Amino acid sequence: MGHLGGGVDAGVGASGHGETDGLTQHGGQGRGEDPLDGAQPGLGGPPGEEGAVVGQVEADAWHAPIEPHRLRASTRLAAVSTTTLSVDCGGGGIKASVLDCEGNIISRAVRTPTPYPLPPEKLVETIASLASQLPGADRVTVGMPGMIRHGVVVATPHYITKDGPRSRVLPDLVEAWGRFDMGAAVSRALGIPSLVLNDAEVAGAGVVTGHGLEMIVTLGTGLGNAVFDNGVLAPHVEVSQGPVRWGLTYDDYIGEHERLRLGDAHWSRRVRRVVDALRPMYLWDRLYLGGGNSRRITAAQLAKIGDDVVVVPNEAGMTGGARCWDMARP
């Protein structure tokens, strides 16, 4: 396990499956038993199961990923002075900052708790409020949980609830969010081009090297993921809402509620088992573990998780906001 200190529009997220449909730029539980302990191949196994022990890469050894192979040549010169407002919308908080053309943060980040209940218009207003506290930008990237296609929200797991994750789902919010054109709404509110993506895709854009098949799993309020093939966002199944056992989803199994209930040691063991389960499904060249909770994985589990896995900083959810504009489609 290594440490690094430091999508583009996929149709996957809250529904548990989907396809990448292309990129559109808009103008203008209390459970005492681990359900996966020995329950399924690849997910079980004894807690002391051995894995590869690898070295730690210190935070100051981090260098920006190399440029993906497939970038739109026409955007390279145009992007020299382009600034991007990057907004990371999570289940517990929403933060924003301004990036230069290379994805470097050039303004202090501003943050606000995610306001619930949260209809689409309220999220747009929240983004506009954060933007008003920052320098002006040429374009905006919004990363948010859920299935996003061409900037349109197909489904979102958190924002349809009364008080946030694991609270009651409100039918009116399900209807309001279904097929809401978030990209167009944000562009109208801010008066600049917008790109609205799944939040794991934005984070992945900030860390991938452009070599081989790379996957990111983000650990926060829930679980997010994205897959990149030679620097290009690839069609992928969103595992967060996939079933584990006893009606649990992966969000339930290793989300923030379970981490708080179990403690970091037991929760970290679950994370390792999820990685072990996903590895034969994706056969990645490299897996990145990001999100706010990636830093909470214990050293004991990091030592067993494999040298094809790298922990990356939570800031990737922000810094990827610039790079994802230049990621070409196959």
Role assignments for model-derived ranges:
Residues 93, 148, 278, 282-313:
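Glycine-rich phosphate-binding loops at beta-strand->alpha-helix junctions
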